[in-house]
UniProtKB/Swiss-Prot annotation:
It comes from Arabidopsis thaliana. Residues 30-163 form the ENTH domain. The keyword Membrane applies. It is found in: Membrane, Clathrin-coated pit; Golgi apparatus; Cytoplasmic vesicle, Clathrin-coated vesicle. This is Putative clathrin assembly protein At1g33340. One of its GO terms (molecular function) is 1-phosphatidylinositol binding.
Length: 374
């Protein structure tokens, strides 16, 4: 009972602080009334009660910043100040969730301006008091959530509605080979960094902000589904071009494959855990394909052999890899044939005519013609 009274007292005190913050906003001499409305809306969205971020308030913030020039730096300042001043887990978590929803639900222009504000240091989310505390598992989740958002702000939603890492200088690629190389050596490492932060944000044992954690984790999972599809495409492209790379590039590629093997295994475990939560069962989980370390070892061995001989992936090497995969599949039923490492078994028919210098040449030709007529 004492704990309940203490929690109730802290909540009442927090609500009083919220009203005081709104009162201070009223006496501020803002050039634009919209700035006052934005500050009040941020306080309401991140109040000390245990209610989730209100959709109505969220839409109000989006409307205000969309129709008020120069409001994004002001909004970034309000978010940074809210995180720096609060000592309440709920307020900190709701402020981070507000920032996350702004990244997810705003226009592309607002998203880009938030990215610029974070890059310039105007928007600071990593200097909060809970970043130095290890007293509670809730603090640990908030720390991991901050790390995730710092990685997430480096991604942007493209015109197709998919997440992609921000490209410096607006780099464009005109040829398919250039696009494939970019996918492997720029986007794939970014995917691995993104997934690494996702894996740290496990919602297990995150009391006392369970509802907030589940809301945040739901958004994280939805974004991880998109990034995983890009991740899978990148690994497929990496395996396809592995034997065409230089030796240093192949060594780098094999290192990425080893890291991917462990990450995807951990990602499957995380998805299985999250399916057990009521609010996350209905999410559209992707089919995560397992990557066996045995397959990576086989690729590394063939890569080393190919590097010594100085040739690309030949039919003999491809057949060797395929045979190795077939043997591994007999010992491991859990490995899916749709994995990026599954290479098709190819049978190639020689189209070279062979001329026999014997007396039965004409008869052989007739037999050949009959065989083709069939």
């Amino acid at each position: 009972m004492r704990l309940d009274l203490s929690a109730k007292f802290r909540q009442v005190l927090g609500l009083a602080k919220d009203h005081a913050s709104i009162g201070r906003a009223i006496v501020q001499n803002y050039n634009e009334k919209a700035f006052f409305d934005i500050e009040v809306a941020v306080v309401r969205a991140t109040s000390h009660d245990d209610c989730p971020v209100d959709d109505k308030t969220m839409h109000e913030i989006l409307f205000l910043v969309s129709n008020t020039p120069g409001s994004i730096p002001f909004l970034a300042e309000q978010i940074s100040r809210r995180l720096a001043k609060t000592r309440d887990c709920l307020v900190a978590g709701k402020t981070l969730l507000l920032f996350h929803r702004l990244l997810r639900g705003s226009s592309r222009s607002i998203e880009q301006q938030l990215h610029i504000a974070h890059t310039s240091g105007h928007l600071q989310i990593g200097c909060s008091w809970f970043m130095m505390s290890l007293d509670s598992r809730s603090f640990v989740f908030l720390q991991n959530y901050v790390a995730y958002l710092q990685e997430r702000v480096g991604w942007i939603i493209n015109q197709a509605g998919k997440l992609e890492p921000v490209m410096s200088g607006g780099t464009k690629f005109s040829r398919y080979k250039e696009k494939s190389m970019d996918l492997v050596f720029h986007i794939l490492p970014k995917c691995q960094e993104f997934i690494a932060q996702v894996l740290k944000c496990s919602p297990v044992d995150a009391w006392p902000i369970d509802n907030l954690v589940q809301a945040a984790t739901g958004n994280i999972l939805k974004e991880s589904f998109q990034v995983y599809m890009t991740y899978s495409d990148g690994m497929t492209a990496l395996v396809s071009m592995l034997f065409d790379l230089s030796r240093p590039a192949r060594d780098l590629a094999c290192g990425m494959l080893r890291k991917a093997s462990q990450q995807i295994q951990d990602l499957r475990i995380l998805y299985d855990k999250c399916r057990g939560f009521a609010g996350m069962k209905s999410l559209d989980y992707p089919s995560v394909q397992a990557i066996s370390m045995d397959h990576i070892v086989a690729l590394e061995e063939c890569s080393s052999y190919g590097g010594k001989r100085g040739f690309s992936l030949s039919t003999n090497l491809r057949d060797a890899i395929t045979c190795n995969e077939l043997k591994q599949e007999q010992h491991s039923a859990s490995f899916s044939s749709t994995s990026p490492f599954s290479l098709p078994v190819e049978t190639k028919i020689s189209m070279v005519w062979v001329v026999f210098d014997n007396e039965d040449g004409e008869e052989s030709d007739k037999q050949t013609e009959k065989a083709y007529e069939r």
